[in-house]
Amino acid sequence: QVEADPSVLNLSAFETFYEEKRPFFSEGASFFKNRLNLLNSRRIGASPNYFDPDSGDLENVSDNTTIIGAIKLIGTTNSGINYGFINAMTKEESGDLFIGDNKNRFVVEPQTSYSVGKLEKSILNKFSRVGLMYTDVTRKNSTGANVLGLDWKIGLINNRLFSNGQIVRSNTDESGDAFRFNVGYKNATWWESRFWLGSYDDKFDINDLGYLRRNDMTWSGMMFKIRRLEPIGYLLGSSFEIKLNKKWGIDDILIEDELSIETW
């Protein structure tokens, strides 16, 4: 038995994200997880809603799409390449469409195949790796979608100099692009600094199998922190942090401009 989702009152224009609780999909899910979430397995077996009738009343529709079958492979090759693959097939879902005195069957969700694959390889040292991930949604007699993403995590100088990020392209009716990265340095004793930058264009869409709160957005920011871990008199330690973060939306409209200063 799968734990039910909590009740959420969502008054925003954005979709609510629910955590995966089905063991088949939740076990090993961390391998596919990244900041830009290309796999939201809750799409598989979700409420059927791909097609909406232009008129009439739709009744007798299943609450969830039926999963016909699924397969998952996760492991590591002899050469040290980590791999993961998931494929699931869902059946066509229909309902009764009433228009006046007429009743017809209406396809709400076509038969669909969901696939995701990822390869990951350690490079340079134990702190660094690079990954390549691909997702595909194929709908019977309907438009599908696919996404290709490159991600990395690099750590140098005993992981004091670090960077991570993603570059992603989506293909639905149109192609869209996105990237995000941050780079930073953490001194072993008293300071650290970080810079980040990212952008999703207005055609970027991964929501057939992933989760994206919104597209058409650019952001950048920086953080600088000074810390002292050794006691000074009666003080056990002290820190100072300054952080600047900006986000722009449609037509370069500023949607967030944050400056924060913290001491403790």
Task: Mark where each language-model region is.
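Conserved structural-core and active-site-/substrate-pathway-adjacent residues in large, well-folded domains
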Residues: Q1, L73, L119, G149-W152, ...
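Residues that cap or anchor secondary-structure elements
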Residues: V2-G75, F85
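Flexible, surface-exposed loop regions and adjacent strand-edge segments
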Residues: V8-F14, G100-P110, G149, N182, ...
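Flexible, solvent-exposed coil segments and beta strand-coil junctions
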Residues: G45-D54, G95-G100, F127-Y134, I157-Q166, ...
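Extracellular loop and loop/strand-boundary signature of outer-membrane beta-barrel proteins
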Residues: G56-E59, G95, G100-F106, T135-T138, ...
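Exposed, low-structure sequence patches enriched in small/polar residues
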Residues: T66-I68, I74, A145, N158, ...
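Active-site substrate-binding loop specific to GH73 endo-beta-N-acetylglucosaminidase modules
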Residues: I81-V116, S122-N125, R129-Y134
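Surface-exposed extracellular loop regions of Gram-negative outer-membrane beta-barrel proteins
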Residues: Y114-N171, E230, G237-E241
